[in-house]
């Protein structure tokens, strides 16, 4: 499981989170994977590329999980 700290920010957009963590090499690829329904947020398929991910949420892509903390 990966952990990502927002470091004082209120949120991070879903496509940026996948890129920053290193699960994808580009934001464009992240957007494509999200629009294809391959990413879940809190157990639900998320199709919004710019979905705001906040503290306490869990993002899943393939077999990887990302927990977002403050």
Model-assigned labels for residue ranges:
Residues 2-4, 58-70:
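A positively charged, amphipathic N-terminal helix/segment that binds anionic biomolecules
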Residues 1-12:
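A detector for short, charged/polar N-terminal pre-domain segments
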Residues 12-55:
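A basic, amphipathic helix-loop patch mediating RNA/tRNA/ribosome contacts
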